[in-house]
């Protein structure tokens, strides 16, 4: 293995019974034929004579690819007429060079030596030795017929198994690191497989059950690359012979010592595979809505993403370490898919609407709206799993009363309405619908047959769900009426955008001021004492600032029930001023009857989009008391007020005269603003 250490020995002898002492003696190693792969350390040379360390009796040399020991004179002087040969052994340590072999490469090299007596040099034998480098690879994998379909990627194509496939949120996905063990290793002191999914953490969530992380082995055809494709189902589970460690996004499997010992001198190569099961978990659990935000998409948009928000691939890396050598794997990636899920609230035709978008528009209690749920996904051809379950869940507001019989589902590709299942009548249908009044939810489950025919990989299903509902008469004017739906594909839940309707908001007020005849109309006389014959002004602020309505405002005005025993008001004196101070009394109907002043916007010619007819605004209501107290409105047959009046406040000025006084009596006055069927009282 690269970076492994080793030692080489050269054996020789000092011959006995020589007629004269030797003039020189050398013993050495020449690694010229292996110099590309190894290096020897001069400082490590040790020489023994008959097993006894005699290094100090030699000079040590290194030149190029040669390392040798030459006898000193003191040793040479002992070589004359010895009784027997003396065994000489030179040992030198070395190391396999790093970065020389390619991953999976195995080479055979030889190493020579020599011994030299005076001028006679004798070469040694050249024993061969092999060097090998591991070659791991990795892939994303998926379930197939309920079993994990383990794969290999020996060419490191990043296109095997589930690599590059599109996953839905909640899908199951796994990762494998495939390593090999050579069959002719001389020593094995470490085998470690590592998987690091840091770059895929935005999408991938490792199983919380660490016992599901497994290691498998199988006899292999080669040690140059992975070769056992279905090792999870056909291999041997050896997880108990490894220590599994999870540190953040890094998972390591480190072999036990007894397992390492068994890998020396194997009969056949082995493949070992680390398996990590997990789940697709969009945006670290924050779901499709957060993914859309992270990629600057609008709520409800369709999105396929193979990168993190920072642009890096949703890739996974790994490595295999054998002894001191670590080789990295390839880095395959996977992708996520978010289907389009659109929601609209529509101005409904029976309310005089033109089916226009009514999102964020004002809707009054008692008015109807139409909701449309639309999805038109371009399903990827390489979805990791078939779509087998499709469900719509609409969560409507607690203050919406749905008109359940208006539910319709249409295949927009053909314009054909889908058929509701009715088993008692023998109608199989394309879907079933369930309304949960307590949870305010509508759930639509599509039939298996419909899903199989219309939601296949690579298809373009187009479905619209619509239903109508009425805003409750009890809806508070401080709460928006909202709606959202979610599309469920298999186990993936994708929310739509949220649509909302604003409640009507009107804040009328009233003040009591001096009359211009007796003083300054800007000076309040609220709470002051008045004398018989004194005059003043009741001024009511008619609040029509809110103008972004889903439907036409059909009634707007004020009703002021004043104390007619003590003050008198003439209808001819009443005037209405806009925010610029202009007199717009002519756009209002004014009546005073039985101590009550009525000031209401006139009805005008009103176009009804759905019928194409214009309803005349005249004649105006003859009895404003009856008009002001009437409930309900028929938008298709009754006129509305002039919508250009909306968007500002009006001052309704009602001059009065004191016609009776009683010592200590307080004259009180409060007005009511009526807008459509809503009422808002002023201060008193």
Name each model-derived stretch.
Residues 54, 78-82, 141-167, 219-245, ...:
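Surface-exposed intrinsically disordered loops and tails
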Residues 12, 43-45, 111-115, 179, ...:
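One face of beta-strands
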Residues 19-22, 86, 116-117, 184-188, ...:
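Long, low-complexity, polar and repeat-rich extracellular regions
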Residues 2-24, 161, 165-192, 363-389, ...:
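Short beta-strand elements of extracellular/lumenal beta-sandwich folds
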Residues 12-16, 31-33, 94-98, 115-119, ...:
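Beta-strand elements of well-folded, non-transmembrane domains
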Residues 21-74, 189-258, 385-446, 553-625:
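A surface/secretory-pathway sequence property marking extracellular, secreted
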Residues 6, 10-11, 67-109, 114, ...:
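Low-complexity, intrinsically disordered segments enriched in Ser/Thr together with acidic residues
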Residues 1, 101-103, 107-162, 292-358, ...:
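Extracellular/luminal low-complexity Ser/Thr/Pro-rich, glycosylation-prone repeat/linker regions
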